[in-house]
Structure formats: C-alpha cells, structure tokens
Amino acid sequence: MDLNTLPFHSINSVNVSSAPTVNERSYPFLLDASAGVSGFNPVVSSPEKKARMKYKKNSTSPNMDVKSRKKVSRACDFCRQKKIRCDMDQSPRPGNACINCRKHHLDCNFTRTPLKRGPAKGFNRNADEKQKRASGSAKSSSPAVNGSVFSGNEASPSSRAPSITPVDSVNTTTSAIQVPSVTLTAPAPLGVDQKISQDQKPDSWLTYNAQFAQNSPQLAPSIPSPMKLSPANQQAMPPYPQMLGPGSISSYTNSNLGPSAGFRPPTFFSSPSPQPYSGPILASTAPTLDGSYLSNPSNSNPAVMSLSSNFPSPPKPNNPVYLPPRGNPTVNDRVSNVLPSITSFDSSVTTVPSNSPATLNSYTTSVPSGMSRHPMLMNPSTPEPSLGVNSPSLRPLQSLNNVQNSYRVASTQAPPPHPLRNYTSDAESISMRSKSTQASDAATFREVEQLYQENVEWDDAAIDRYYLLIHSTLPILHHSKARLKSELEKAPINLRSSCLHAIYSLVNRPPFATLGHVFHNTPMKAIGLLNLICSNVQDLSNRILHLQTMILLAIESDQRGPTTITGRNGLPQGMWLGAAIGLACNMRLHIQSHLSLQSINEDMDSDEALCRRAWWVLVVLDRWHSMSTCSPLFLPETFINLTIQDQKLLGTFPSQLVRLSLIVGHISDVFQSPDPTDRQSPIVTQQLRSEIDAFRQSVDVVWGQMNLLTLAVTHVKVLLELCINARPSTVLVPAMKMATILSSSSTPMTPLNHHFFSLATCVLIGVFDLPELQNEARRGLEHIRECIEKRRDIVSREDHEDWDYIVLKLINAKMQGMPINSDPSIPPHVPPSSAFAYSNQEMDSATFKDAYLYTRLCNLGYLGFLI
C-alpha cells in the first residue's frame, strides 16, 4: 500500500525506525519527494505533535531532561571563600544552612550578587569596602574645580586657578542621551548665571556638543555659536584634550583659526615642549586662560576668547622674583659665573657686610632697577628654589634656619647665612681671627713651597741620634747609614726633603735633643703637607721611603705632647698611623712573605727586609696607641705571625717588643669590650696571665742584662692589674717597680718612655689618697719627679708642654695637697655625643679611691687621663 493513500489518522500508527524525529533535529526542514531512499520514510508533523513538543521544551518539571535544564544553585559565602561544594541547590531560606556552615557553626549567607557573565573567580573579600575605597580614591585623586557653587559672575577666591580632571576618571554613563556628534570636554566656565547643583554629573567637567547645547536651557547662553560643529570638521578633532602645560600659551596665541578651517580645540591643552630661554620668567605667574596674556587677541578664536573671558584674571605680583635659567648660563649672567671661595666652607669666616665692595662671596650683581635677582648659592646644603616664593616646601627650611625670606634677597642686602656657620655678635674679632688664620695658612704654604724647592742637606749628627735613640727600639730605616744615604740621593727631591725633615724634627726635639741643639724650626704642618704632595713614588724603593717617612711622622706626633691628641698642635698620631697602614696594605705587606735565613744574612737592607721591618713597627705602634688612648686597633690578629726569620731580621729587643706588644693588644681588647663584666671573667684573666708568664720564661736568659725589657714587662703587668680591677696594694707593687727603674741611670731613652712615666703616675695618683698606701705612693712620685726634672734641665725648655711637663705638673699638684680631678670637666678631645655617657658612667673601683678616676682611665687611656 502506498503511504500517500493512507488516511490522516493512520499515519501515527506507522512505525518507521530509521526516520529521525523532530526532537532529534536542531532545525525544521522540508522533505523533497524525489529525494527518497530505501528504508527512509519522511514523517509529516501534525499540529498536535507540535504543541506537545512545545510543551515538553518549556516544561520545568523535575522529570524533564537534565541537559535542557539551567543551573540555578549557587554557593554560600563560606563555601565560595573556601572553594568547596555547597549543598544548597535551591535559593537560600532563613533558618536553612548548608552542611559546611552547620559543621563550623556559621550563618549561611549569600551576600555576593551573581554576575551576568558567569561566576567570579573565587570569593572577593571585602568587596563592598574595596568598592567604596576605590570610589573615594577616584574622587580624591581627581582635582575638581574648587568652589563649584557660585552665582552670577562672582567666583569664589579658591576657584581662581581651576584644575583639570583627567578624562579617564569621569564616569560617562549617560546612556540616556544618544548624540551622534563628537563631544568636546573642557573645564566648566566660572561665569555661569545659575547655580550648579552637586548632583550633576560630571561635577567639574561639562560635555559640549551641538545637540546637548541646544537642549540644555542652563548652558545654552554660555556656549557661543561657533561651538556647533559640522560633520566635515569633526574628523580633524583629537579624541581627548591634553593637560595644561607651560610653554603652550604662545602656541595658542599664534593659532589662527578661521571659519573655513573649522573648530579646533584650544591649544593650551597641548603637552609642554622645550622652549628656548628668552628672559627671566615670573615665578608667581601661572599660565591661565585670561585674554590679557594673549599677544594678539584679534587673531585668536572668538569661541575660545568668549570661553576664557569667564575666567578671573590672576593678581599681579607686587614683588616679582626672577629666577636664573636652568639651562646653560649666559655669558652676561655674572651670578652664574660666580665661583665659591675657599672661605665659604670655613665655619670661622663671617659674611661680607652690605656696605663692603663686591667680592666673590658677596653675591651682589647688577639687576634691573626695582627687581631683585635670586643668588645662585654655591653651598651643597642649599636646597633648590621652587617656583613659588611662599611654597610650602620652603617654609620648614625658613623656620629651621631663622631666615625671613632667603629667596627674596634684594641687591642691597647681605646674602642669607649658611645654616652650618656659627655667628657671634663680635664681628670684628671674627674678622681679625679669620685674617690671622689666612695669614698663617699663607705662611704655611710659603714654607711648603720653600721646602718643595729646597735641597735639604745631610746632617750626620741628627742621623747618629736617630740610630742611637730610635733605631735600637723601632728599626724603621736601613741598618747601614751609608745605604740610607745612597737611597736618599737616588730618591726625588721632594721625597728626600720630606724624609730628612721628619728625621730632624723627631731627634731635635725633647726628650731626644740636648741643650746644644735647637728645635727644628720647620713646622710639622708644612712637613705633613710636603709628605702628602710627594709625587713619583711608583717605584718600590720610593714607596718604601714614603712609608718610612709616615712612620717617623707618627712617632714624632706621639712625642710632641697632649696637644696633638686635642688637635691644637698638628695632626694626631692616629692619623699618621692610619695613613701608613693604608699604604702598607696597598703595598700588600700584610701578606706573609717567607724570607730565607740565607737571604737575610746576605742582605739585611733589601727591599723585602725593609718591608717586613716596617710592617712589624706598625704592629707595635698600633698596639701601644690603642692601649694609651683607648682607640680601636687598626691591624687585626689574622695578619700577624712572627716567625724565626722575622726575629732574626728585627733583632733581640725589637723582636721581644713585638711579642710583648701583642699581649698589650689583647689587654686593649678587654679594656674596650662592650661588656664590662669581661674584665672580671676568670677565663680572660687566666689567659692573660699565662701569656705574660710564657713571655717571662722565654727571656730568662737575658733578663738581668736588659733593663728596658724589664720595664716593658712591668708596664704590661700594671695594665693587667688595672684591667681586672685588682686591689690597690696589688697594683702599687709593679707601679713602684716602674718608678724605681725609670729613675735609674742605666735606663736608656726610647720612644716609649713617656708611656712608662704616664702609666706609673696615673696609678700612684689614684692610690695616693688611701692612708695605708700614701707613704709608698709619695715615695714613687718623688722618684718620677726627680728623674723628670733632671732630664728636663738637659733637653727641655720651660715653655714647652710635652708629656714630661704634664706629668711633672700633676705630681707637684698632688704633692702640695691640691685636689686633682675632684670635679673634673669633660676632656677637650671627647666628642659631645659621648660626653653625657662619659660623665654619667658609674664604675665600681677597688683600685682607686675615686671611682671617677678609674672610669676616666678606662675610657680615655693613661695618656688621655693626664689631659
């Protein structure tokens, strides 16, 4: 039977398995009668079947197909934050919570609003607070026109300089107005007749276009007719205006916008461009939109002129301030060519009075009448002036320096004072002092010039005194006198002069000079400058000679007296030691060099031997300087290793002195330890005592023949007893032994004798007030005074204040019953930063009766104790 001949109601009863149903197809189609194939019979859809299919598609019953359903469940706040599955498949109800919230005893809340384009990536913490913070920061970062509520043509005082808000920060969600024309954003004019309400958006920017201007009754009177744009001229406009910048007024005034050229945005929104300097610019004059600043108002755009006419004109400055150009100074600008003088960095030099003639330091230049020119201060600490005279950045500086207005200096006034200079009321005394200082400096430079050109002669007597008094203790120069003379002859003239002057100044002064020799007349400042300007020291022999000269100057500075510590009489010893040690390390002398005994026996004055001897002399001087002044060590223990070759190279007493100096360095470390309890530590005490005992056992063979070595060992023992704060009777025994040895005629003169005298005097003065030890202490002080007076009559002058003079002065005061340091003041060489801690430090003393004297000894050293 043909399918087409069947009745209509019997079509549904035919079972065609291969024919796809309408539900399985994604779109309806038309069947072609001629496109039939075997096994395929098209199905004709009926209206009932279509209605049943439509009802099944739109059904929301739970028995419907899963694929056709949409996801309606969402997670709660806790599950979203933890990124776990939430079993709340339906909308949240009060009193109902998911399993996770019930487990943690939390409220199941659904505060997050689902987004249109799908769920967010995780839980956004504090979304409301972040949104409020972002909106608040956007409002605060966009400077709107101050004083937006006004009436008529009167603007508020704060709105005279309107600021421009960036276009990106404006919320342009005005979808209600559909305008096809291009919009132009510009600052709101200040001459609007009606009051602008606060709820208008945007508040500080107005969107101008032709259709909006016609439909707005409030803004139509304020917008001129040229603001209407034609479609032909809209393409030449930039999409956004630029920020206001300097140097753009000229480009705006030179623009000639005719009617045929179409409307162009104001060029005062263009970015700044570099302009050539054509003259001074008023600092207080800001670029504004006032028409009075235009060079040719007739050539400018009338639209912009009408828009800018509503802006108030800025006030004219009463006292304009001219700033110098920031680029290259002009040739005619005398202020830019002024160079700083040497006295501008001197704290003792005052400023030049206003009625004095113009000098390099007066900063007075010729400027136009009625105007003041800002001086270009050459001091590094002077800040760079800003554009505004009353800028907030200048107010803290002016209040700090008590300068009324340092950036409005008239041509008839004196320059502002430097903040680092100390001024006094007596200007004449300061000027006289500065003149005397300049005269002394000029004399010093003249002497340096003479020394630089002078060929110093060889003095055999002075060289012999060096080998007798210095070289036997500290072998600095060559062992051979002839070898030294030949090396000096080959050296450059300035280096040779510096070395010979250093030798003569050391041996021709107390306590080494005799009555028949006068002091060396050349000042040490000149010798030091001559040594510092020495050139042509690239050769190894010249560098060794330069190092030896610095060591000699360090010893001479130590012998000069207490005035060198305070800086009143030349450079201190620490300065020369630091320079010499720096040069030695630059020469790589701290690296251990292995010298064979054969090479030492063949040549004791080779370059390698001289370098090793100079290194060990620096080690000795560094240890004794650190202990005597409580200064840190320059050379660490890691670069010190005394070998048999070094002992052979140095000699008997210098090698033993090096070993003893290492113990002095250990005691100095204990004295300067940050923890004062280290001095009473039994382990530290036992270690130091074992080092001294080991040294004594190694020199027992020659102990009775070397009086100077006995004195040095006793000196170290006194330092140890003071370090551990021993009882007064224990410290008095080695101190009395030192006084006895010093008064002996067999004790030679060495560069370390003033150390022995000073330490013994400090201990005897400290225990003098104890009744049970006063007689013995008095006897020791008399021995030291007799020795000093006898030697001072031979080698010293009455007006020369060396170490012997200071020791003798203290002994006489104590013997006459005068109180010493009963209420002492802070020594002059103690810095002000540590003076408070020094004066208030409390330290228990079992050695001295006065605990303050013991504190003074521990903080300043035995040489600083005498000052």
From Swiss-Prot:
Any one GO cellular component localisation term in the record: nucleus
DNA-binding region of this protein: 76-108
GO biological process: DNA-templated transcription; regulation of transcription by RNA polymerase II
Record-linked InterPro entries: Carb_Metab_Trans_Reg, Transcription_factor_dom_fun, Zn2-C6_fun-type_DNA-bd_sf, Zn2Cys6_DnaBD
Comp. bias intervals (Polar residues): 137-167, 248-257
Keywords noted in UniProt: DNA-binding, Metal-binding, Nucleus, Transcription, Transcription regulation, Zinc
Gene3D superfamilies registered for this protein in UniProt: Zn(2)-C6 fungal-type DNA-binding domain (4.10.240.10)
Location in the cell: Nucleus
Record's keyword annotation contains DNA-binding: yes
Cross-referenced PROSITE patterns: ZN2_CY6_FUNGAL_1 (PS00463), ZN2_CY6_FUNGAL_2 (PS50048)
Pfam family, one: Fungal_trans
GO molecular function: DNA-binding transcription factor activity, RNA polymerase II-specific; RNA polymerase II cis-regulatory region sequence-specific DNA binding; zinc ion binding
Record region (Disordered): 110-167, 217-257
Protein name: Uncharacterized transcriptional regulatory protein C320.03
